[in-house]
């Protein structure tokens, strides 16, 4: 039943999203739709929690609040702040906005107040950083919603009414996170239509699963997990779920995507005290300078520019390599940053463009430092091209471990040819994912797929990690039987001669030739 509800919820939510689609770009209507879903979730969650708390007294949230007992009100507020991290007075609940719509009122002022009240309820509490500015991207005065105030009100009312008719399944007893899964599905659907912008906030679930499976290998429980470029938080959530992580840390540069990540955490039921997502530039302003993590995962922006400022030569994250990543390509700056935050027993896995495997100059020096001096590189996994939204370039996964003192090899996997093509996108199927993860975990050699290269072999290749140097995927063509080909040609020539004769006969009968 829960799987049926899961699929039904996905379809219903995407139908609602398309109500806004004609009025604005994919990214714009994404933030409105996901924001309203989140508002409904917070409202239903608080009503459900308080109603359950008051059930023995034969009361519910709205009745208790209407009694005007100040002591009871304060108790309810305190309970919600401890359990949920926020509070919504009944007049600002989603259901109250729906009542106003049914009364044919202009609900935009009430809706705007409601969203602000949720944020304001956390001021001075431990959850303030998790809720502050959470709805700042929902601009109810946006001309994209309509030309007049009435047009805007009608469109928003239509969306809210449609969402109101959808059961979020919060009361479903299931091992499937029904609403969380639907939210992830929505983000993925928006990413599919967002073109190049998609890479800023979304890592395909198949890639997230590979990264999560790799960094949790051999671990029954993670103390913490970290993503320095966390986007919408999907990769973090997948890894945290895989590794039963106690704490989740992330940093995101884009303020709008940062809001999306925090919503995603809360909507997946991660308690406000169990995650810390910060807004800022990871390389320029590290939000967690003293922290180290059991698992580090990331899908950083490919070959982005960074300042490579002189000050970074004295930054512990980069100084040990003796050289900075080039200004035009921050790939190794992100990799060194992640390694710095990885604890001694942890595992790091990040997505990168293939250029990091073979480019020279400062990047070649950093690569040699990581292999020759530190022996940190555990595996290189080549992925198919065109599996990320917004870019068709082939990518790889770099796996790093600090506890490799006794390992004198690096595993190379070429999974670039194993995928299913769906329209314009390539997709990894479950069997492809399983093969990659199993090969990594067992560190096994498979002809034309994987190779366990010794460090000496890598050194002999001048620390070039380009996968074709280690995994030979060349398919030899079957030998050609020259005699058989010559005979086939002769047979065809004989058939052609016969046909020419037949054509001549027909042409003579028609009087077209003498």
Task: State what each model feature region is.
Residues 197-298, 303-312, 318-321, 332-333, ...:
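Conserved S-adenosyl-L-methionine
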Residues 1-215, 273-282, 287, 382-386, ...:
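Non-catalytic, mostly N-terminal accessory regions of nucleic-acid modification and defense proteins
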Residues 4, 286, 290-514:
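A conserved structural/catalytic subdomain of Rossmann-like adenosyl-cofactor enzymes
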Residues 191-194, 246-247, 420-421:
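Short small-residue beta-strand/loop micro-motif enriched in glycine and branched aliphatics
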Residues 40-53, 190, 219, 243, ...:
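A generic secondary-structure signal for well-formed alpha-helical elements
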């Amino acid at each position: 039943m829960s799987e049926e509800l899961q699929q039904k919820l996905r379809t219903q939510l995407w139908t609602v999203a398309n109500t806004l689609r004609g009025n604005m770009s994919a990214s714009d209507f994404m933030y409105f739709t996901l924001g309203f879903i989140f508002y409904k979730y917070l409202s239903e969650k608080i009503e459900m929690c308080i109603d359950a708390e008051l059930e023995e007294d034969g009361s519910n949230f709205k009745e208790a609040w209407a009694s005007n007992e100040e002591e009871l009100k304060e108790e309810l507020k305190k309970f919600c702040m401890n359990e949920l991290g926020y509070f919504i007075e009944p007049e600002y609940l989603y259901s109250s906005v729906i009542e106003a719509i049914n009364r044919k009122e202009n609900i935009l002022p009430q809706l705007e107040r409601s969203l602000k009240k949720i944020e304001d309820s956390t001021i001075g509490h431990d959850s303030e950083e998790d809720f502050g500015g959470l709805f700042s991207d929902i601009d109810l005065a946006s001309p994209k919603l309509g030309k007049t105030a009435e047009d805007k009100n009608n469109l928003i009312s239509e969306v809210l009414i449609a969402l109101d008719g959808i059961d979020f399944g919060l009361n479903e007893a299931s091992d499937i996170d029904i609403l969380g899964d639907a939210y992830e599905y929505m983000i993925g659907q928006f990413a599919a239509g967002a073109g190049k912008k998609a890479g800023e906030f979304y890592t395909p679930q198949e890639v997230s699963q590979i990264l999560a499976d790799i960094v949790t290998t051999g671990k029954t429980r993670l103390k913490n997990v970290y993503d320095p470029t966390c986007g919408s938080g999907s990769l973090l959530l997948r890894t945290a779920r895989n590794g039963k992580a106690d704490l989740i840390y992330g940093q995101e540069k884009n303020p709008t995507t940062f809001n999306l990540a925090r919503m995603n955490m809360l909507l997946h039921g991660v308690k406000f005290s169990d995650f810390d997502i910060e807004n800022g530039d990871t390389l320029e302003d590290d939000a967690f300078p003293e922290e180290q993590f059991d698992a580090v995962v990331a899908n950083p922006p490919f070959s982005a520019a960074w300042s490579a400022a002189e000050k970074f030569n004295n930054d512990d994250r980069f100084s040990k390599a003796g050289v900075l990543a080039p200004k035009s390509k921050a790939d190794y700056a992100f990799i060194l940053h992640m390694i710095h935050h990885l604890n001694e027993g942890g595992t790091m896995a990040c997505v990168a463009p293939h250029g990091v495997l073979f480019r020279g100059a400062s990047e070649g020096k950093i690569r040699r430092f990581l292999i020759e001096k530190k022996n940190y590189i555990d595996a290189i996994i080549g992925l198919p091209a065109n599996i990320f939204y917004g870019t068709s370039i082939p990518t790889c996964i770099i796996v790093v471990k600090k506890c490799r003192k006794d390992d004198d090899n690096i595993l190379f996997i070429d999974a670039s040819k194993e995928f299913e093509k769906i329209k314009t996108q390539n997709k990894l199927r479950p069997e492809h994912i399983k093969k990659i993860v199993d090969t990594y975990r067992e560190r096994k050699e498979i002809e034309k797929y994987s190779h366990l290269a010794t460090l000496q072999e890598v050194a002999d290749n001048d620390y070039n990690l380009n996968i074709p140097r280690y995994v030979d995927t060349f398919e030899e063509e079957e030998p050609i039987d020259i005699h058989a080909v010559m005979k086939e040609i002769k047979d065809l020539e004989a058939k052609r001669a016969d046909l020419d004769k037949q054509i001549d006969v027909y042409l003579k009968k028609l009087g077209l030739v003498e």
